Each structure stands twice: as C-alpha cells, then as structure tokens.
C-alpha cells in the first residue's frame, strides 16, 4: 500500500515539537483568516482545525518512523504523552473558538472500506470512477499518513478494513491541502467523500473532495512497528490493543460468529432460549466459591450464580422440553490461562433423552462452529494439529486410566488405604509432591480415580475425546449408571487436554437427589471447618484462591421442584470461552474475553 509509513510524535524531540508548534500555528492562523469562511461546512471544519493543529501535526508527521528508529517505549513516556495531549487540546480549543465542534454528532456513510474494495475491484491501475455518479462517503480512524509535494495519503480503518484516501492539491484548494497535511493527526476519526480511483501502483483509493474531523484524538497511538507489546497493558487497555493490533479485534468478531452459530444449531433442533437469575438465594449447580453480595432492601445475602443448571431444570419441571441459556457464570476462584472469574457457557436440557444425545450435540456444535469460522475441521492449536472430524473417541474413565497408567481400578478392592499405596507406588516417578498430597487426601475410591485421571490422564487427551461414566461421589446431579454400580451416566469432553463440556443423564429422583446434595454439603462443611481451624486469623487473606472456607447451602426450592416431577432428561454445559480459544488458536482465556478481570494496577 502506498505511503503506509506512520509519522509518529514519539520520534520527534519535544523541543523541536514546541518550536514547530509555534511557527506552524502562526502560518495556520494566517491561512484561516484569508479563506476559511468560503468553505463548505465539512471543509470549514478541516480548515479551522488546521489553524489550531498545525503545531502538533507537523511535529507528529515531520519524520517518518522506521524499524531502525528508537522504540516508542522510551520516547512515549508520560511527559511526552502529556505534551502531545496538551498540544491536541489546544487544537480543540481553537476549533471551538471558531465556532466549530471537533466532536461531531453524525456522519452519513455510504459504504464501508470492505464494500468499496469489493465494488471497485474492477478498476484498472490509473483508472478513476465517474466523479458525479460514483461519489462515496466513508468514515474511520486515521492509522497512517504521508504528505509530500502536491499529494497526500491517509489510510483510514473502519470496522471492516482499510481504504486509502488520495488527496491531491488540485482537488482541494491550496489552503485546504495545507490544512490537511498540517492538521490531521494519526488516531483522529475522519469522514471523507469523493470518487474512487486505483492508483498507478494499484492501490484502490478515494480521491477526496471533502473531509471533516469527526473525533479529535488527544492521545497518540502506539508506535507502528513496535506496537502495543506490554501484555498487561494490552488487557487493561483493550481498546488500544484493538486499534494497534487488528487481529485482536478479529478474535472478537469470530467469537460473535461462534455464539451465533451455537444459537442457530441448537434452535434448529427446537431448543428455546430462556433467561434465569444471575442473583440467586443459593449458589447451586456446581461446587465452587461464589461471589456474595447483600441486598439492602430485602436484607439478605445473594449470590452471583455459579451455574445455570438448577433453574433450567425448573423449566423442565414447568413443562418445557428443550431449553438452553447462553450466559455469564461467576466463580470467586483462581485466575489462570484457562480460568477467569467471569466466563460464558451454554447450558442446555432436553427432556426424554440421555447423555448419548448430548454427545452427538456436542460434536455437532463444535464442528459447525469450526466450519463457520475456519471453513475446515482440521485446525492448528498452538502448534498441534487437531482433527475435529466426527465421530470422536468415546471411552470410560476407568479404561483411560488403565491405558495411560496401567492401573486397573476394578482390581484395587474396597480398601482405600491400600488403593492409595498402590497408586502412589505405581506413579511415584511421575507425581509431583502436591499431586501426592492430593492423592492422600482423597476420601473415597471414586475421588481417588478422579484425582489420578485429572493429574495424569487429562493432559494427554489432545484429540477430541468423550470421557464417560464418572464416579458417583463426584457427580451429585447425574443419574446412576444403568450397568455399573458406583458410576454415573456422565461424560466430559476434552480437547487439547482441556475440559470443553460436561453432561449427564440428569438425576430426577428427588429422594436420591436430596441425599446426595446433603452428603455434598456435609463433606464440604467438614473441609470448611478444617480450613477455618488451620487459618491463622479468621479474616486473613489466603494464598490459595480455591480454599474450602466458603459456605454451601441446599437449594431447597430446587428439591421441592423435583418432587413435582421432572421428566427423564439429559443436560450439558459447554464453555464458550474455551471453545473460542480452540477455534481462534488463542493461548489464554484473556485473549478471548474483551475485558478480563485483572489484578489491581500497582
């Protein structure tokens, strides 16, 4: 693309900047006094803008930055930023002093950049469209500029892409052309209209007949070549990250497409989207520490939901047969590349089906989404080729543990102590000290099986794999297995060693459900009491973000609902953030959440 070299204020010493500010402002004022009131309103805006802006623009664009120039990380200091901001604020003041508003109310766009690229792709090099018939209007942010002689180029970026503005002195008055060169800063949001042309070098451009500053940017954008590289700052100022790195914004466009495809897929099977409470009287449906708030008017504690499950099941009790919800979940736990305290899931429930139906649905959702955003089913994730072609492997947890570790849990017997010793001996060379502690703390054979699976097997499940038939001790909401005592009809889907989905044949026996939930509460409260005893101070901050010191209560209303009768059903929860990570090749969950939760800035 012609003239894409960005001219940056950070490459200009401040003394030179201030010297240029003084001289160019005097020049611009003279220009404004001679001609400005004869311009159209749009051009008057640009003309008046130049009278107040020549200074900083000249400084910001007088020297092209390049790969061999000093990094903006050193020159774009707080003092430099404040100097830039001060100069740009003076431009704003002068604009308003002339009765012109540098923050427009509206601009009529006729096309997006991408539409223009498509509509006028037929233009040959050097060919121009009919100026009277094909007058177009566009708006976007100035991300690059260059001016020399009787020609100036601006690169404008909108939501769809970029387009070049071709600014000839012959088309604009002498005053207007100088004002264009001197006033417009990189980062400004500009509206422009004109005819279409493909330059001799092949760049499709708008030959500008008129322009207007729509929003005056006060702070400089990151350096073109070094960009916004501070990871923490990228997450804290995601808006700047999106401007500096267009591929970041593309992730969120693809995320939106994935969510849309999920809705389209499940609704094609007759599922109804519903909404359930975010503020709940009891945090149920999962075992996780909730966020707690207090409702002043009601005088009671409320919890941000940790799952949507229990209210969606109430919908089945109420007579709906296929329901789903895409919504935010909140868990007051640790943060990692795979965990954010606020995340998005789809949970769905279908009456008169079992967990085999949900395996088919999980395959369909993921493959449909991959085709929608990637156009293929073989994708790359962080250097590993993932094949999403159906059908996916389906294997029991027992068999996978035996396959990877050689330990057959069916032969360990009922003695928990002996089972722990056998496992620790067999895996002594692969277990970390914390893993051994976790094994010793297991309270049942089911917990022990799951612990070995999570530590040793789970990371090895790279290709899509359904892990079936989880122990009943860790699955309080799942129906008992029809053929294997002590197990449940539950599966989890793993891809790239990460859990993507969790599903059950849902437990509908209200008596069994109460017994299991009461046992879960009893076990948790025992751990909680131990955690409180071990705490040095009652209110001391713990290093472990996932400790057991929070309270768990029964959702009595849910248990009451079950007693009215819930039909046989299957249900599934699928993590949308992790699915987006997979399909956009994003390494961290923070890369797919626009504004992730972060530590307080020091």
From Swiss-Prot:
SS bonds (residue pairs): none
Described function: Catalyzes the specific attachment of an amino acid to its cognate tRNA in a 2 step reaction: the amino acid (AA) is first activated by ATP to form AA-AMP and then transferred to the acceptor end of the tRNA.
Cellular component GO terms held in the UniProt record: chloroplast; mitochondrion
Family, per entry: Belongs to the class-II aminoacyl-tRNA synthetase family.
Listed EC numbers: 6.1.1.6
Source domain of life: Eukaryota
Residue ranges the UniProt entry marks as DNA-binding: 136-214
Gene: OVA5
HAMAP family named in the record: Lys_tRNA_synth_class2
Compositionally biased intervals (Low complexity): 50-62
Needed cofactors: Ca(2+)
Protein name: Lysine--tRNA ligase, chloroplastic/mitochondrial
Keyword Aminoacyl-tRNA synthetase: yes
GO terms of biological process kind: lysyl-tRNA aminoacylation; plant ovule development
PANTHER family assigned: LYSINE--TRNA LIGASE, CHLOROPLASTIC_MITOCHONDRIAL (PTHR42918:SF15), LYSYL-TRNA SYNTHETASE (PTHR42918)
Molecular function per GO: ATP binding; DNA binding; lysine-tRNA ligase activity; metal ion binding; mRNA binding
Ranges of Basic and acidic residues composition bias in the record: 524-543
Cross-referenced NCBIfam families: lysS_bact, PRK00484.1
Description of the deletion phenotype: Lethal. In heterozygous plants, aborted ovules.
Region (Disordered): 50-83, 524-550
Locations listed in the record: Plastid, Chloroplast; Mitochondrion
């Amino acid at each position: 693309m012609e003239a894409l070299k960005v001219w940056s204020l950070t490459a200009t010493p401040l003394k030179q900047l201030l010297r240029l500010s003084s001289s160019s402002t005097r020049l611009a004022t003279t220009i404004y006094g001679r001609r400005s009131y004869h311009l159209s309103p749009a051009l008057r805006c640009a003309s008046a803008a130049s009278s107040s802006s020549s200074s900083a623009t000249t400084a910001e664009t007088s020297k092209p930055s390049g790969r061999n120039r000093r990094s903006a990380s050193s020159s774009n200091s707080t003092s430099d930023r404040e100097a830039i901001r001060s100069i740009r604020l003076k431009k704003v003041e002068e604009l308003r002093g002339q009765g012109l508003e540098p923050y427009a109310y509206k601009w009529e766009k006729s096309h997006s950049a991408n539409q223009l690229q498509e509509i006028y792709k037929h233009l040959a090099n050097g060919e121009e469209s009919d100026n009277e018939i094909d007058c177009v209007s566009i708006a976007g942010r100035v991300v690059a500029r260059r001016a020399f002689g009787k020609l100036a180029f601006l690169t404008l970026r909108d939501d769809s892409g970029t387009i070049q503005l071709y600014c000839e002195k012959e088309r604009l008055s002498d005053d207007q052309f100088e004002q264009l060169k001197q006033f417009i800063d990189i980062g400004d949001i500009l509206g422009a209209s004109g005819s279409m042309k493909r330059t001799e070098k092949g760049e499709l451009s708008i030959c500008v007949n008129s322009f207007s500053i729509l929003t005056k940017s006060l702070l400089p954008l990151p350096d073109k070549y070094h960009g916004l590289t501070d990871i923490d700052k990228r997450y804290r100022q995601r808006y700047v990250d999106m401007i500096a790195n267009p591929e970041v914004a593309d992730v969120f466009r693809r995320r939106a497409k994935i969510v849309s495809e999920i809705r389209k897929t499940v609704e094609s099977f007759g599922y109804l989207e519903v909404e359930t409470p975010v503020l709940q009287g009891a945090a149920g449906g999962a075992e996780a520490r909730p966020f707690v708030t207090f409702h002043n008017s009601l005088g009671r504690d409320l919890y941000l939901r940790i799952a949507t499950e229990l209210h969606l099941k109430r919908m089945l009790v109420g007579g709906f047969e296929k329901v789903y919800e895409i919504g935010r979940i909140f868990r007051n736990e640790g943060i990692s590349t795979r965990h954010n305290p606020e995340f998005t899931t789809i949970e769905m429930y279908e009456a008169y089906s079992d967990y085999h139906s949900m395996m088919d649905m999980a395959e369909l959702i993921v493959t449909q989404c991959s085709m929608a955003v990637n156009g293929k089913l073989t994708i790359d994730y962080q250097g590993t080729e993932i094949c999403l072609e159906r059908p996916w492997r389906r294997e029991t947890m027992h068999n996978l543990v035996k396959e990877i570790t050689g330990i057959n849990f069916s032969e360990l017997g009922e003695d928990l102590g002996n089972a722990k010793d056998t496992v620790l001996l067999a895996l002594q060379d692969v277990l970390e000290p914390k893993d051994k502690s976790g094994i010793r703390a297991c309270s049942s054979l089911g917990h022990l099986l799951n612990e070995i699976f999570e530590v040793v097997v789970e990371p090895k499940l790279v290709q899509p794999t359904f892990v079936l038939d989880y122990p009943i001790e860790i699955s309080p909401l799942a129906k008992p297995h029809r053929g294997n005592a002590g197990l449940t009809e539950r599966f989890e889907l793993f891809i790239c060693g990460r859990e993507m989905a969790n599903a059950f044949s849902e437990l509908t026996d209200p008596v069994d459900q109460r017994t299991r939930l009461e046992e879960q509460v009893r076990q948790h409260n025992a751990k909680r009491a131990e955690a409180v005893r071990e705490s040095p101070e009652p209110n001391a901050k713990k290093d472990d973000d996932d400790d057991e010191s929070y309270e768990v209560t029964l959702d009595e209303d849910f248990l009451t609902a079950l007693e009215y009768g819930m039909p046989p059903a299957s249900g599934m929860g699928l993590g949308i953030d992790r699915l987006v990570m997979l399909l956009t090749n994003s390494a961290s969950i923070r890369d797919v959440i626009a504004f992730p939760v972060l530590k307080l800035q020091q």
